[in-house]
Amino acid sequence: MLPLYPQYAAATTATVCDEVYRTLMKMRWQPNLKIIPHYESEPLYIEAIKNSILKKISEIKWKPDLIIASYHGIPKKYFDKGDPYHCYCHKTTRLISEQYSDIEIKTTFQSRFGPQEWLQPYTDKTFEVLPKQGKKNILVICPGFSSDCVETLEEISIQGKESFIKSGGENFEMVPCLNDSEDHISLLKYLVTKNL
């Protein structure tokens, strides 16, 4: 079983596993089950992200001042209870950063809701302050999302861009998620084959 969440979190990967276990509990015959719980540091994954960034940079006519790596947030209390998600996100960003010597990459967390504190820094608040810090040309990647969805297409590409430009930013581009790219398919094939 390969949950398509590169960075393990109890709220995502473990929830998928729980549902699979509930289904298996109803079966008289139990198949062998192998779980690939995370792949945040898999070299093919990092390479795929790097390639997607390079592709986007080749398409634009400006140099990014900064790359934002925006991950889905989780409540801070989950991290305080030992959920490793925060660490996995920072590890992925560090490994991607090692591929670039001339562009800073910063981790942020998006999609929070409710009154409780979530992992920080918040992506939306970061977009608002970057232009004041001289970072007026940014690329955004969402390495925690295997495919584009409302959180990337609406929250980042539309709302995030509007907020950034309104705050004084000049250029904003989101790098598409890996989606059905050849690099992503090769990565998934490798992960499954390696774990058979």
Where are these regions (language model features)?
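Extended amphipathic ligand-handling, pore-lining, and cofactor/metal-binding catalytic surfaces
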Residues: 2-196
